[in-house]
Amino acid sequence: MKIAVKPLPFRHYIFECLLTIAGLGLLAPLAFGQSTSGAAAMKIGIIGAGNIGSTVGTMWIKAGHQVMFSSRHPEELKPLVDRLGPLARAGTVKQALDFAEVMLMAVPYGAYGQIGRDYAKEFVGKIVLDAGNAVLARDGEIGKEAREAGVGLTTAKYLAGARIVRAFNIMGAGRLASNSHRPGEAMAIPIAGDDPEAVKIATRLVRDAGFEPVLVGDLERSRLFAQGGPLYGQEISAKEMQKRLKTFK
């Protein structure tokens, strides 16, 4: 049975996201430039400008990438975009899909089915980093399906034809922000995907965000770092995560 959840007013939600990012020192003045990986900057679209979308998007902008944040109310993203500078822009979901080489899914999982239906043509062949987590109390039947079949495989079903890589789902935005480019060994971000080229791009973007990627395997193995999985929420180095992975084989 689907459970209705009353959302916060959208303006309040964006304001809360801005406060979170500003408090963590991520809203510094930004300028155009080559990405921190040394490769050419990419065009990235983000579906969902809430906590995860705005936080990870800010990391990529600081790394020199162009980012389009999208939502049903792109005009209400103006405060975020204005603060982030010339590498940031806002648009509709369709505009973001047309703009981007790579997409980040950062919306409640219950929305995936409708998004997949509305933009089926645009998703075909698109590299999509999936940061979603299925929450039973929020996401209804699709959340239940994802918990049973695995989020990675369920995302691949609803975003048919997209080149899915699971990434950035292992913790909340505040913890991601505080661990980005941390001193000492970089924090590991587990990733999983079936498409080698998409995994290669995800690896680069995880590093550009200030983390060290650890390839867990294909989409089916992304269960290991789904919410409730053994690798979920772990603030550990890549070396430690690889050590733990060996115990799951």
What does each model-identified segment do?
Residues 1-12:
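N-terminal secretory signal peptides that target proteins for export/translocation
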Residues 16-29:
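Bacterial N-terminal signal peptides
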Residues 32-79:
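NAD(P)+-binding Rossmann beta1-loop-alpha1 motif at the extreme N-terminus of oxidoreductases
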Residues 85-88, 92-127, 131-139:
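Rossmann-like NAD(P)-binding element
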Residues 91, 158-164, 182-222, 227-232, ...:
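Internal alpha-helical scaffold of NAD(P)-dependent oxidoreductase catalytic cores
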Residues 132-165, 170-174, 178-180:
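Rossmann-fold NAD(P)-binding glycine/threonine-rich loop
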